[in-house]
């Protein structure tokens, strides 16, 4: 009688949500304002107070409408739990040192005899679950590869998510030049390249960007014909959600796709012949290590700081390496075994060398910028 009266009162008041929590063999019932549920820390303290366990670290879970037992450990999933309560919010509490993390997941409340029974009727003699290091408290993606189906195999489009943290994007860019092989011959064009990655930065942690990758687009805008300062401003303006299209210097890590059919999400039709002119492009990598003395470093504030430039002991001539090799059956670029080095016009010395396949040269001109 009392239970029916309490249920009728709770259903009659639209702004009140009834909560039924279980800890061990104890059940507690209380009400919350649905429109003002508060924060998770407040709800966590309320559960400790109701069950009289103020100094016990517990793991909180709730039953959703799909029969899943899901954790509550931050404000987002706490508000999600409140929104799905119809009309009762069922809470399950476990001690962290005795928690069964395998009980969380899809259809866990439907499989009552195996999963949920371990939570409702804990047995000290049952087999202990495997040790779990921790459960994620607040996790978000940091990077992703997008538009795989519409880009050539030699290109990669990377999205970096910053989420307002103080962690920098963490890569340096510089201007340089690359040589494109077109039906009209060799064409040398300026380009923007990644010169180095900051250790511990966002770009290095993703593993999707590397030194000497050529930057082709920034958030859908081509960088061709733009200066280094303009590209830097574009990246700073979109640093919160940066989408950068690059031509990786190491083409071996690219996804190999079938040129005729698309077998799965990782294999898709090669559209390089449809949407892009057929051409082979060779990038140039630095013959010598970059000097930190002539770098322009730009942080998130966007204010450049010029580092004093040291006078070089001698002037080194840049050499342009042209690699022309096609792999049979693939529309891409592969480094040959022997490569001739063509001197840049205006250089004093002409030098021909044989380089290993993994070694490339890059023309080093311009300043270097970090985001």
Swiss-Prot record:
Species per Swiss-Prot/TrEMBL record: Mus musculus
Gene3D superfamilies (UniProt xref): 2.30.42.10, Phosphatidylinositol 3-kinase Catalytic Subunit, Chain A, domain 1
Quaternary state and interactors: Interacts with PARD3. Interacts with GTP-bound forms of CDC42, RHOQ/TC10 and RAC1. Interacts with the N-terminal part of PRKCI and PRKCZ. Part of a complex with PARD3, CDC42 or RAC1 and PRKCI or PRKCZ. Part of a complex with LLGL1 and PRKCI. Interacts with ALS2CR19. Interacts with ECT2. Interacts with PALS1.
Domain Pseudo-CRIB: 133-150
GO terms under cellular component: apical part of cell; apical plasma membrane; bicellular tight junction; cell cortex; cytosol; nucleus; plasma membrane; protein-containing complex
Gene: Pard6b
The protein, known as: Partitioning defective 6 homolog beta
PROSITE patterns per record: PB1, PDZ
Subcellular compartments: Cytoplasm; Cell membrane; Cell junction, Tight junction
PANTHER family: PAR-6-RELATED, PARTITIONING DEFECTIVE 6 HOMOLOG BETA
GO annotation (BP), single: cell division
Tissue specificity comment: Expressed in pancreas and in both adult and fetal kidney. Weakly expressed in placenta and lung. Not expressed in other tissues.
């Amino acid at each position: 009688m009392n239970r029916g009266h309490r249920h009728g009162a709770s259903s009659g008041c639209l702004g009140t949500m009834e909560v039924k929590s279980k800890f061990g063999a104890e059940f507690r019932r209380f009400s919350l304002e649905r429109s003002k549920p508060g924060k998770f820390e407040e709800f966590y303290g309320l559960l400790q107070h109701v069950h009289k366990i103020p100094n016990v670290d517990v793991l909180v879970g709730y039953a959703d409408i799909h029969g899943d037992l899901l954790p509550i450990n931050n404000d987002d999933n706490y508000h999600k739990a409140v929104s799905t309560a119809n009309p009762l919010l069922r809470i399950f509490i476990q001690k962290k040192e005795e928690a069964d993390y395998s009980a969380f997941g899809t259809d866990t409340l439907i499989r009552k005899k195996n999963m949920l029974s371990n939570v409702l009727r804990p047995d000290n003699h049952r087999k202990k679950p495997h040790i779990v290091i921790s459960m994620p408290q607040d996790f978000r993606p940091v990077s992703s590869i997008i538009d795989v189906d519409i880009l050539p195999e030699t290109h990669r489009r990377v999205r970096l998510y910053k989420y307002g943290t103080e962690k920098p994007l963490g890569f340096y860019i510089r201007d340089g030049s690359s040589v494109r092989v077109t039906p009209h011959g060799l064409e040398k064009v300026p380009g923007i390249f990644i010169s180095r990655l900051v250790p511990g930065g966002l770009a290095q942690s993703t593993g999707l960007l590397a030194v000497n990758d050529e930057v082709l687009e920034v958030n859908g805008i081509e960088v061709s014909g733009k200066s280094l300062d303009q590209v830097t401003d574009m990246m700073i303006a979109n640093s919160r959600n940066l989408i950068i299209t690059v031509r990786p210097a190491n083409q071996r890590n690219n996804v190999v796709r079938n040129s005729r059919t698309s077998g799965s999400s990782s294999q898709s039709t090669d559209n390089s012949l449809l949407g892009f002119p057929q051409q082979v492009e060779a990038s140039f990598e630095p013959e010598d290590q970059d000097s930190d003395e002539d770098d322009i470093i730009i942080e998130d504030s966007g204010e450049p700081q010029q580092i004093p430039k040291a006078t070089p002991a001698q002037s080194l001539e840049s050499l342009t390496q042209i690699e022309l090799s096609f792999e049979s059956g693939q529309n891409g670029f592969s480094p040959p075994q022997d490569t001739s080095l063509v001197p840049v016009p205006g250089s004093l010395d002409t030098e021909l060398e044989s380089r290993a396949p993994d070694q490339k040269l890059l023309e080093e001109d311009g300043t270097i910028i970090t985001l």
